[in-house]
């Protein structure tokens, strides 16, 4: 079966935004106008097609990115809806990895919010070209031009409007298309499915000309030939303008900007046109980096129908009817359902039972999947997020995704004995789906701990245990993931020698322990020369240190950001063994870290609080009491914005306190930023409590 849509007419796009910018509503409207859903799903009444997990319907926020396929003007658009809540940035990060372009949705009133900055940074990191859609133009306080300025100032980007609004708030009726220089006015009777193209209203002609001039100037900068034409006073034609916008959008030197109101069904078709005109096809983005597992050399995988199959698993979901779904972005070649595929990350072969095309929560069986597509594979057992699937003869390992360590842990206890076993299985499944969620057993108490990126993240996990897996669980107090590190350099030797009849044990090492930059992790350097320690024992020393660093000397927390150099030692022909050197390495590390000025580290959260001015003093006083460092204060739409770094341990229960302090008018967002040193008086309390 040949492919229906050629590769250059495919768009893999994500819709990314802050909570409440109207992202899910925008996705819904796209599905409505491209003919996928016959009744528009409203988030307000909990019926949106994209939000298909029960909790999402209740909370009105999007948690898992559903991948949906739709068609517009002979192009196939694969749409990935991404969550806007900060605890789910891992979801955004994974979808960014497999997108070719993105639509960033901003609220015309709220503008650039802290979460939008995070998502914007992630899109920059993966080099994803994007267009901006300013939504909710019908709301009181809507201001398109404010958002344009905020994108320049806060996101340091270059937004170039390609349409501007006609009216605002309740007088918003349509947009002026600056490329065609026409007014587009939507018809309310047809739910926005029809619109009229008219001449530009006389009162807006001046503004339209001014913005058209800005657009043409930005376009001319993209190409020398266009620049000459522009400077020579010649008009650029529509084709040239479109080509220039696309060039600038792909190299990210300009960001095309549009507006509309998804809820009121205005501006969605012009957004779809822009997706097709300006966002890249799979053939127009840079080739994906990978590694040849045989030679460990870097290779590039080009998006094309030619060549052997290669794809990346970017999401795993458990579906109540078909079991585990593995969402895969195909970069090269094609694959038929029922065939075998090689997981080069795990070095295992897997059989693909079925291939499913997802329409948010409806599914369609397909026989074959081609390059550039996004598709759900059924029947894979060992494949996890970030694994590469390919042809065994032409193996390649695509760039791995990096997942953050959890910053918060909560103990979970099953209510009954029957729940105990079910809980283990359920947590395992959830950890497979979400790489930023971890499950572990606390050694001292035997309790099960779950770790994640924030309170909401773990709340939803516990909620899913109850709902999807019917496991009743009690949760304990949240615990913070402290770390330990060292502040000074120390050299130590340790000789481990045991003689008690029969074969003895002998391992002798000299190590140097040095602090490293925050966030740089652990490094082991072997400087043994002349065979004073045989090379087969060196990995044992490293292993001993790695085991010992899981339990720091201060309070038993993992030790991070240090370098160990093994520079001398001795061995015994008969008595030396791997075990002896492992113990020697571990003891030397413990002794060295006691002497290297160990300190306790805690997760510091980047907190942004938005409050009316009259509560400003109370809020700042409260953040100071929580050991916060205030970084900046801004104004946004008549509210005060306080930016601060606050230790996570001080932020538990903050939402309730903020609500009561501001009579429900304050809001806040927080995300993990870095690990900071705990002040000595507080560190002392924590250490005493741990050693209790």
UniProtKB/Swiss-Prot annotation:
Q: What is its main location?
A: cytoplasm
Q: Say yes or no: keyword Cytoplasm present.
A: yes
Q: Per the database record, which ranges form the tr-type G domain?
A: 8-283
State the GO CC annotations. cytoplasm
Localization annotation: Cytoplasm
One Pfam family of this protein, by short name?
EF-G_D2
Biological processes, Gene Ontology terms:
ribosome disassembly
What PROSITE patterns has UniProt attached to this entry?
G_TR_1 (PS00301), G_TR_2 (PS51722)
Recorded hits in CDD domains, A to Z, give:
EF-G, EFG_III, EFG_mtEFG1_IV, EFG_mtEFG_C, EFG_mtEFG_II
Cited HAMAP family:
EF_G_EF_2_B
Put simply, this protein is called: Elongation factor G
Question: Could you tell me which species this protein originates from?
Answer: Helicobacter pylori (strain P12)
Q: Which gene encodes it?
A: fusA
